[in-house]
A protein has these predicted regions:
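Active-site mouth of glycoside hydrolases
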Residues: 1-217, 279-281, 309
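Active-site clefts of carbohydrate-active enzymes
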Residues: 12, 162-172, 224-236, 247-283, ...
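Alpha-helical scaffolding within the catalytic cores
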Residues: 27-31, 139-145, 202-212, 243-253, ...
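Catalytic-core region of carbohydrate-active enzymes that cleave or remodel glycosidic bonds
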Residues: 179-194, 211-215, 219, 234-305
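Short, charged N-terminal beta->alpha structural module
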Residues: 180-182, 190, 357-384
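A short, well-structured beta->alpha microelement
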Residues: 202-203, 380-398
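Aromatic-rich peripheral "rim/lid" segments of glycoside hydrolase catalytic domains that contact
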Residues: 303-359
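A conserved amphipathic helix/loop scaffold
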Residues: 410-612
Length: 612
């Protein structure tokens, strides 16, 4: 059975980032005992770089003579690692072993909670390009991994905490080279463990490039805090849009990057953002949602509150000090109880959850904000009862019965050879959905059954009716179109909005405005009925389970004799578990939750048996 990681980012309750220099074995043992009792069995830990490698330069006649340790002694190993700190980390692992806790080790911890942690002699050097800094990073990583690779408590090696935050963004080449140096150094010493990213903020076109990182790393990580994520706070924390952020971003990494991905940091940013009760509900939805949608696990930030710590970063960053699962005196917050309950569910049910069935492929195109548009499409699809797989238009497009091209923009939508392949698949029977944001496709009328008459960049919107519901729309550019073979599904007095066209054996849906782009920065957008557009696209998809409520997200996980189905309430209201089953299946067992009513932010897990 594949284990789903249930964990936390750990700093000792008494000292925070000073835990290694202010070591207290008794407190650390009490911390880990407390966390373990609450089903927290994985800790991400951070050997602070300048504490572990306290180097000091010595000069003669204006030139560097040698490096020693900070206390003026000669190094006791070729890596300039402090033996006292190494012994403390060894003892830390001993304690973890006592309680059956595994550890993800963040190696180059030069950044933490807004503070730079770099050895003093290296502070004026670029950590990504300076030869001296790179030498000491390589020595640190090599020495640390050599020292502890035999320890069974270590689950994986993490590059370090958000290493892409240590300095301003380098070029793509520099980001690649730095990642390769650290990863290859780890692998040269220990090839038995995964190397995980430790970073968020990877993108298709940026310096920290998702394809480069996929080439070098074994596991991606996401840190999808709504408070910090772009467009993450447009809606309330407890809205379906925000509740699906972590799931969508993690799925984006898995599908586009082609590697497993761990939700390595998640949290609410404390009681000034939401109540502790809401934080627990937020965690509960995300535990079930990330588990059901293919994540390696989910880890909270962080273990204990740090209000009592009066040094940087805690004296700087007021948002950092109330993020714990518990108070420093071991008073458990509701979120810790949520993690314990979810751990009990996994331990008792012993579910080996297969991969969820995917209903469509969303092709992310050039000249768009791919991650944000993908997220919007993901939420709309969930509300319409479908689950998406992401891909990027320059890479191989997975086989599917349904494809989405959301909010296409600009003259360079996608490579022509990829478009030709897609068009052929549609002609042979697939369904294609296109929404327009001034994107240009050749032979557009032939593909869509819609002819463009004119175009302008004026902001012209309006409303239309679909399934008896009024839907508002807007755009920053307008295509004036007429039908040349398509069927108009939706139109108003002024224009045609939504069309359907038989293309060969397939079907093409065209939406004459950028629904997904519009939603990126629009508050409460998902409260409306716009998801009905997606419901049209998925009307004929084959499903084992269908939910009639837009706030109930369903994943179906086929098994040898049936399926496991996870039904998640992404809302703050009770909803009837209003589902329909394919005639070939019956409910064999309710594993978790209530089959009649799903409470706010709760989930129901059922086992289905195939009878035909």
């Amino acid at each position: 059975m594949k284990d789903f990681i249930i964990g936390v980012n750990y700093w000792a309750s008494h000292a925070g980032t000073n835990m290694w220099r202010n070591w207290n074995e008794e407190v650390v043992r009490a911390d880990i005992s407390f966390l373990s009792e609450n089903n927290i069995k994985t800790l991400r830990v951070f050997p602070i770089w300048p504490d572990s490698q306290p180097i000091k330069p010595y000069y003669t006649s204006g030139a560097l003579y040698e490096y020693r340790m900070e206390d003026d002694s000669l190094p006791k190993n070729p890596y300039y690692l402090d033996e006292t700190m190494l012994a403390r980390f060894e003892k830390f692992l001993d304690i973890c072993g006592e309680f059956g806790v595994e550890v993800i080790v963040g190696l180059v911890t030069g950044w933490m909670s807004g503070r730079l942690f770099v050895p003093t002699p290296l502070l004026d050097k670029n950590v990504y390009t300076d030869a001296t800094s790179l030498m000491f990073q390589e020595k640190f990583v090599r020495g640390f991994v050599c020292r502890f690779k035999h320890r069974s408590e270590i689950k994986s090696w993490d590059l370090g905490n958000e290493c892409n935050c240590m300095m301003s963004f380098p070029s793509r080449a520099v980001a690649y080279s730095w990642t390769a140096l650290i990863t290859n150094t780890i692998k040269s010493v220990d090839s038995t463990r995964d190397v995980v990213s430790g970073m968020d903020g990877l993108s298709i076109n940026g310096s920290w490039n998702i394809f480069d990182q996929a080439e070098l790393l074994d596991v991606f990580t996401t840190h999808p805090y709504p408070y910090w994520a772009e467009y993450g706070s447009v809606d309330r924390l407890m809205s379906i849009r925000t509740l699906l952020l972590a799931t969508a971003v993690n799925k984006f990494y898995i599908d586009v990057g082609g590697k497993p991905s761990l939700v390595e940091e998640l949290g609410t940013m404390g009681p000034q953002v939401c109540s502790e009760e809401n934080a627990a509900d937020f965690a509960n939805v995300n535990l079930f949602s990330t588990w059901a949608n293919g994540a390696e696990g989910m880890m909270w930030w962080c273990s204990f509150d740090q209000k009592h710590l009066k040094f940087p970063p805690y004296s700087w960053k007021k948002c950092e000090v109330e993020l714990g699962m518990a108070e420093a005196d071991y008073t458990a917050k509701p979120v810790l109880k949520t993690f314990k309950k979810f751990g009990d569910f996994l331990n008792n049910s012993k579910i080996d959850l297969p991969k969820a069935k995917e209903d469509a492929v969303v092709i992310l195109t050039r000249e768009t904000e791919q991650r944000a548009i993908g997220w919007m499409a993901y939420v709309l699809a969930k509300m319409a009862g479908a689950n998406l797989k992401f891909c990027y238009c320059e890479k191989e497009i997975p086989k599917s019965d349904i494809y989405l091209l959301p909010s296409i923009s600009g003259p360079d939508v996608m490579p022509q050879e990829k478009l030709d392949d897609l068009v052929e698949r549609v002609y042979n029977g697939a369904t294609l959905y296109i929404s327009a944001d001034c994107g240009m496709l050749p032979e557009f009328a032939k593909l869509t059954g819609v002819k463009n008459l004119d175009f302008d960049r004026s902001n012209k919107g309006g409303s239309f009716m679909l399934e008896g519901k009024n839907i508002n729309y807007s755009r920053n550019c307008k295509h004036y179109i007429e039908i040349c073979g398509a069927e108009a599904i939706c139109q108003n007095e002024e224009e045609i909005i939504f069309t359907k066209f038989g293309f060969g054996k397939g079907t093409v849906y065209y939406l004459n405005y950028p629904l997904e782009k519009n939603f990126m920065n629009k508050s409460n957008a998902f409260d409306g009925d716009d998801y009905l557009i997606y419901k049209q696209i998925f009307a004929n998809k084959e499903s084992i389970v269908n939910a009639r409520n837009k706030y109930l997200g369903v994943t179906v996980h086929p098994t040898e004799n049936g399926a496991i189905t996870v039904i998640i309430n992404y809302s703050g209201e009770c909803h009837s578990c209003d589902i329909t089953l394919n005639d070939e299946y019956i409910i064999e067992e309710v594993i978790c939750g209530d089959i009649n009513t799903i409470k706010p932010f709760e989930s129901t897990v059922i086992k289905l048996k195939k009878i035909i």
